[in-house]
Amino acid sequence: MSRSIKKPPFCAPHVLRLVNKAVAQNKLNSIINIHSRSSVILNKFIGLTFGVYNGKTYVPVKVNDNMVGRKFGEFSPTRRYTGHVGDKKVSRK
C-alpha cells in the first residue's frame, strides 16, 4: 500500500539538520554519514554525497535528480550475493 497523498515525504529530522549544517558551512563535497535508510531523498539533497550505513560500512551515494522521491536504502545493498556453487562432480575423459 502506498503512502497517503495528504502526508509529506518522510525524512528523519537529524538528516535534515546534517544537510542544513553542511550547506551552511559550505562543505558540499564532504560525505554526510547517515543511518536512516528509510528517509526519502528530497530536492535539496541533489549534488550532495551521503554515506548510507548498510550494517557494516558506509556506502557512498552521490545524489542526482533521478533519485528524488526514492529512499536511501535502495542504493545501499545489505546482502551479498555469493552466487550458486557449480557442480562438484569430476568429469571423466
Curated annotation (Swiss-Prot):
Top-level taxon of origin = Bacteria
Family the entry assigns? Belongs to the universal ribosomal protein uS19 family.
Q: Provide the alphabetized UniProt keywords.
A: Ribonucleoprotein, Ribosomal protein, RNA-binding, rRNA-binding
Q: One MF term in GO for this entry? A: rRNA binding
Instruction: Give the record's GO biological process terms.
Output: ribosomal small subunit assembly; translation
Please provide, in alphabetical order, the Gene Ontology terms of the cellular component aspect for this entry: cytoplasm; small ribosomal subunit
Instruction: Using the record for this protein, list the coiled-coil segments as residue ranges, or answer none.
Output: none
A Pfam family recorded for this sequence = Ribosomal_S19
Relate the protein's function as given in its record.
Answer: Protein S19 forms a complex with S13 that binds strongly to the 16S ribosomal RNA.
Q: What is this protein called?
A: Small ribosomal subunit protein uS19
rRNA-binding among the record's keywords?
Answer: yes
